[in-house]
Each structure stands twice: as C-alpha cells, then as structure tokens.
From Swiss-Prot:
Gene from which this protein is expressed: rpmJ1
Keywords, alphabetical: Ribonucleoprotein, Ribosomal protein
Taxonomic source organism: Streptomyces coelicolor (strain ATCC BAA-471 / A3(2) / M145)
HAMAP family: Ribosomal_bL36 (MF_00251)
One Pfam match: Ribosomal_L36
Family: Belongs to the bacterial ribosomal protein bL36 family.
A single MF term (Gene Ontology): structural constituent of ribosome
Top-level taxon in the UniProt lineage: Bacteria
GO biological process: translation
GO CC annotation terms, alphabetical: cytoplasm; ribonucleoprotein complex; ribosome
PROSITE patterns: RIBOSOMAL_L36 (PS00828)
Keyword Transcription regulation part of the UniProt annotation: no
Protein name as catalogued: Large ribosomal subunit protein bL36A
Keyword Transmembrane helix found: no
Amino acid sequence: MKVKPSVKKICDKCRVIRRHGRVMVICDNPRHKQRQG
C-alpha cells in the first residue's frame, strides 16, 4: 500500500474508489494499491 498525496491509475485495471472518506486505488496488481493521505 502506497500512501501518496495524489493517487492516480497506473494501469487499465486500476479502479479509484472512496472508502470512509479516503480516496483509494485498488487493482489486480497488489503493487498498484494506493491510498490518499
């Protein structure tokens, strides 16, 4: 899980979602998981 000030899609399978007021990227590739913070 990378924590970044701005989250972006890295590949076509990345999806930007909101969980508990946080913006996150979830993907099939676990290296692409990001959270805004």
